């Protein structure tokens, strides 16, 4: 969140981000970068415009997180649940994506796979204990199960 806040306060820096950068804002963090949005459609359109202008990938976190490419493609992730809206969950997402990038996955694939696995781990955690009180470490604990589910 700190890096996104810095970018929001220094918007010119968005154009200096390295190729392959991925931003993972939630709706309010995105609005700090692009201005207030009237509805979710406008928010999505502004995120697409930002991804294109800054030549970055954006994962707009939410009920159905949107993965947006610099070319304007938009993919919606079907996994995840409201219990994942907890401190540290975005850090877990970042860690999953970075692990995929470190293995050589292309940026777009790492963003899509990482978002899916992260959400699936959250869904596994929800089934185990429910949404209320879910914390980031619950998602981490369920990552191996999520990977196993997609490999079967």
List the predicted regions and their residue ranges.
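Short glycine/threonine-rich catalytic loop with a Thr-x-Gly-x-Asp
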Residues: 80-97, 107, 132
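N-terminal loops that bind phosphate or other acidic moieties
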Residues: 19, 72, 104-105, 129, ...
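Charged C-terminal helix
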Residues: 122-152
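Glycine-rich phosphate/dinucleotide-binding loop and adjoining beta-alpha-beta core of small-molecule
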Residues: 1-79
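Short acidic (Asp/Glu) and glycine-rich catalytic loops that position anionic groups and cofactors
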Residues: 27, 75-77, 94, 119-122
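Short glycine/serine- and small hydrophobic-enriched flexible loop segments
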Residues: 95-103, 116-124, 145
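Short, well-structured alpha-helical segments that form the helix of a local strand-helix-strand
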Residues: 43-52, 107-121, 136-144
């Amino acid at each position: 969140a700190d890096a996104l806040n810095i970018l929001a306060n220094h918007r010119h820096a968005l154009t200096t981000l390295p190729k392959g950068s991925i931003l993972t804002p939630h709706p309010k963090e995105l609005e700090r970068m692009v201005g207030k949005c009237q509805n979710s459609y406008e928010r999505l359109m502004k995120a697409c415009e930002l991804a294109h202008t800054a030549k970055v990938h954006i994962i707009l976190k939410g009920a159905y997180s949107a993965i947006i490419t610099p070319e304007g493609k938009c993919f919606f992730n079907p996994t995840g649940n409201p219990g994942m809206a907890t401190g540290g969950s975005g850090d877990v997402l970042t860690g999953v994506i970075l692990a995929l990038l470190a293995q050589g996955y292309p940026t777009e694939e790492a963003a899509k796979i990482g978002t899916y696995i992260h959400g699936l781990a959250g869904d596994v955690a929800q089934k185990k204990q429910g949404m209320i009180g879910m914390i980031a470490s619950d998602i981490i604990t369920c990552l191996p199960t999520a990977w196993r589910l997609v490999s079967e």
